Amino acid sequence: MPSIFTNIILAFATALLGTLVFRSHLMSSLLCLEGMMLSMFVLSTLIILNMHFTMSFMMPILLLVFAACEAAVGLALLVMVSNTYGLDYIQNLNLLQC
């Protein structure tokens, strides 16, 4: 496996580890999710270019569209939670607390 693929997989694993470690803050979780989506985009683009899959050139663009939608929904949720509670703790999103 070339070193570029190893570095991209390591970036994905680092973002996944960041999501697991910093799961108490919504902003940190959103940044780690964006890092995961970016590494998946770069990895899928490199695989498609290396394997010469001409029919699947739209897959990375579709992945970017879903990443943009995820970022928009995440930022809207962050604004809503910070305006309601004043903090970005994920524990505030528990619906069982009344």
Swiss-Prot record:
Its main location: mitochondrion. Disulfide bonds: none annotated. It is a multi-pass membrane protein. Core subunit of respiratory chain NADH dehydrogenase (Complex I) which is composed of 45 different subunits. This is NADH-ubiquinone oxidoreductase chain 4L. Its EC number is 7.1.1.2. GO terms for molecular function: NADH dehydrogenase (ubiquinone) activity. PANTHER family: NADH-UBIQUINONE OXIDOREDUCTASE CHAIN 4L, NADH-UBIQUINONE OXIDOREDUCTASE SUBUNIT ND4L. Keywords: Electron transport, Membrane, Mitochondrion, Mitochondrion inner membrane, NAD, Respiratory chain, Translocase, Transmembrane, Transmembrane helix, Transport, Ubiquinone. One of its GO terms (cellular component) is mitochondrial inner membrane. Belongs to the complex I subunit 4L family. The keyword NAD applies. GO terms for biological process: ATP synthesis coupled electron transport. It is found in: Mitochondrion inner membrane. The chain crosses the membrane at residues 2-22, 29-49, 61-81. It catalyses: a ubiquinone + NADH + 5 H(+)(in) = a ubiquinol + NAD(+) + 4 H(+)(out). Core subunit of the mitochondrial membrane respiratory chain NADH dehydrogenase (Complex I) which catalyzes electron transfer from NADH through the respiratory chain, using ubiquinone as an electron acceptor. Part of the enzyme membrane arm which is embedded in the lipid bilayer and involved in proton translocation.
